[in-house]
Regions:
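Extracellular loop-to-transmembrane helix junctions
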Residues: 49-99, 103-111, 124-151, 257-261, ...
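Hydrophobic alpha-helical segments and their helix-loop junctions in multi-pass secondary transporters
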Residues: 176-203, 268-275, 385-400, 448-457
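Helix-loop-helix junctions that connect adjacent transmembrane segments
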Residues: 175, 180-229, 427, 431
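Extracellular/periplasmic helix-exit of transmembrane alpha-helices
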Residues: 186-196, 251-287
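Membrane-interface loop-to-helix entry segments
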Residues: 155-190, 254-255, 373-385, 405-416, ...
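C-terminal membrane-solvent junction of multi-pass transporters and transport-like membrane proteins
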Residues: 337-348, 384-429, 459, 463-465
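Loop-to-transmembrane helix boundary motifs in multi-pass membrane proteins
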Residues: 25, 104, 145-149, 242-262, ...
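Cytosolic C-terminal regulatory domains/tails of membrane transporters and channels
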Residues: 1-16, 455-457, 461-464, 469-608
Length: 608
């Protein structure tokens, strides 16, 4: 039944030879890998206006030069990540660049930041989209958390079905959002050019503003730069592209940059010209749409596609998180299970862990994840700064043809990214301080996991000079709970191993019961030695393990190995297990950590 449900949800298993069919073309890749970046157009311009709102509407003209600054940073990031794509065509993005050029710890800081950031991407995006949806249907607002969890589960299942299938479904809402905003910007500019919009709604550029300061402008710039989250996703996901993967990834990155630049600058310009003031109740995009079209079909079309893109921005996390996890797992910094492809050739363990972690965040914050946005943004600019600094060192060290121009691009990007990151810490420390706690903890865990894998590798290697003690005999211990077919089956198996000695062990709680059992045993299995252990505290495990320790100590003197044969019956139906004591599993769990003790479980399958 479980298998049938799994097949229904994620589809039939795919052969490894079908991996090429699971690669993305540029159209689908643009949709699923740029959804996070494009969705930030819905809140990036608004963040600039919110930062300027303290000085009044007269200061809103500063949104134009600030937007130009954001576009300069966007250009530097796009050109930089394009260089990263060709320099590191196997993916890995900021983690690989930082690790190879700055050192292991900077690489782990970049990788750890991005892992957490992709979890935040899913939680924040789905929560924001759910808020947009329940704003249109207020009766659903009380169920925000449940609705958000359902969306996360839906996107998780969609990604478990395979990258091409999820792209085929999710591409439509993304391109509908792009179309909706192009129409909005086009009609808005047309209305301005034809005089339909009054020029008195906004203050002229250059109007003096009392109280303006460089610090406030940098704060607004940092807030607006939140629109650049998700730009790095394509460089992490190069392995998902069809061949030639680096060329296709680079073209997709340029297309995303161009779209983001047009949409972001268009919304900022319309918000300025329309004199839009940010409001808790109505978003900036909603106000622009209402002033442009009124409350008609186009208004609701824009609102609907905006809500969808906010939810589907989570898919960028699902595309990039598993691939980043693969790179970290290959370097032994996180569990190796992240390198295993699932039935549909995706890295399903990474997808599932991302979904679970996102749901935990949504539940913990009760769907009110807007407080995580600054943390989400600073988590992106840390790897931005590190990756571009790494590329600066790479060009200085290698000095290939045209290195000076490449160096300039990366240096500009590194400096601006560092300024933005610093502004987040200076202006929103109360919301981002936690990254200074959990990031070192994550790095510590990375190193502990790496240390464990290295230690295991050293111990398992045949090159290790470890003395092998020869096995000259075998003593078999069979824990028994009664005289049944299960025990009989295990004893027959034990006898077939040609052991030097087979010992049956019975743990009794009652003296009378103990005597009766011994008498019956002599008649049933006279050739098998029985040892009865009396348990004063009704424990099976303690007296049994103590006895096995004694046997093992005696056996080791003669280079004998102790084998414990555990009888276990297997019910016909899985749920029947909850009706029985799982003594065999407990015994096995305890004995696994005993040195020089071999454990064998002998199953006896019930027929009804």
């Amino acid at each position: 039944m479980v298998s049938s449900i799994k097949r229904f949800l994620i589809g039939r298993p795919l052969k490894s030879t079908e991996l090429g069919e699971q690669k993305l073309n540029k159209t689908k890749a643009l949709a699923i890998l740029s959804s996070d970046a494009l969705s930030s157009v819905a809140y990036g311009p608004e963040q600039i206006l919110i930062a300027l709102a303290g000085l009044g509407a007269i200061a809103y003209w500063y949104s134009i030069p600030i937007a130009v600054g954001v576009l300069v940073l966007l250009t530097a990031l796009i050109l930089s990540y394009r260089q990263i794509i060709f320099a590191y065509p196997h993916g890995g993005g900021a983690y690989v660049v930082s690790k190879e050029n700055l050192g292991m710890n900077p690489g782990l800081i970049a990788g750890g930041s991005l892992l957490v950031d992709y979890i935040l991407t899913v939680a924040v995006s789905v929560s924001a989209g759910t808020d947009a949806l329940t704003s249109a249907f207020p009766s659903l607002h009380a169920h925000n958390v449940i609705i958000a969890i359902i969306f996360v589960i839906f996107i998780t299942i969609l990604n478990l079905r395979g990258v091409t299938e999820s792209a085929s479904v999710l591409a439509y809402p993304v391109y509908l959002f792009v179309l909706a905003l192009f129409i909005l910007i086009g009609v808005g500019i047309y209305n301005i050019l034809t005089g339909y919009v009054s020029p008195t709604l906004h203050t002229p550029i250059g109007t003096p503003v009392a109280g303006i300061s460089l610090f406030l402008l940098l704060r607004a710039f940092a807030s607006g730069s939140s629109a650049l989250t998700g730009v790095e996703a394509i460089s992490n996901a190069i392995p998902n592209f069809k061949d030639p993967a680096p060329n296709n990834a680079a073209k997709t990155l340029l297309a995303m940059g161009a779209l983001l630049a047009v949409l972001f600058s268009g919304i900022v310009f319309l918000a300025y010209y329309y004199g839009v003031t940010p409001s808790k109740e109505v978003t900036v995009v909603s106000q622009i749409a209402e002033q442009t079209f009124g409350r008609n079909f186009m208004y609701y079309f824009i609102q609907g596609t905006t809500a969808l893109i906010l939810i589907l921005a989570a898919n960028t996390g699902y595309s990039a998180f598993p691939l980043l996890a693969v790179n970290l797992a290959k370097d032994k910094f996180i569990p190796r299970m992240f390198t295993i492809r699932g039935d549909r050739l995706g890295y399903s363990n990474g997808i599932i862990i991302l979904g679970i972690a996102s749901i935990i965040l949504i539940v913990a914050f009760q769907g009110q994840t807007e407080h995580l946005i600054p943390l989400y943004a600073v988590g992106v600019f840390i790897p931005f700064t590190l990756s571009q600094s790494g590329m600066v060192l790479k060009w200085l060290r290698e000095k290939p043809e045209g290195w000076a121009l490449r160096l300039t691009v990366n240096l500009i990007g590194a400096v601006i990214s560092f300024i933005v990151m610093s502004m987040f810490f200076l202006t929103k420390f109360a919301q981002v301080w936690s990254i200074l706690i959990f990031l070192p903890v994550i790095i510590f865990l990375f190193h502990r996991i790496k240390k464990h894998y290295d230690a295991v590798g050293d111990q398992l290697s045949l090159k290790t000079c470890e003395r092998i003690v020869p096995i000259e005999g075998n003593v078999i211990v069979v824990p028994v709970a009664g005289m049944t077919h299960v025990v009989e089956n295990s004893l027959n198996y034990a006898k077939s191993l040609s052991a030097d000695q087979v010992i049956a062990v019975y743990v009794a709680f009652d003296r009378e019961e103990e005597k009766k059992f011994e008498e019956k045993w002599k008649k049933w299995q006279p050739e098998v030695r029985l040892v009865t252990l009396h348990s004063h505290y009704r424990s099976i495990i303690q007296p049994l393990t103590k006895f096995i320790d004694t046997v093992q100590y005696k056996a080791s003197e003669s280079n004998y190995r102790v084998t414990v044969v555990i009888p276990q019956f297997i019910p016909k139906k899985g749920w029947h297990n909850i009706l029985h004591n799982q003594s065999s599993l407990l015994i096995r769990a305890y004995l696994l950590y005993k040195r020089n003790v071999v454990i064998t479980t002998v199953p006896y399958h019930l027929k009804k």
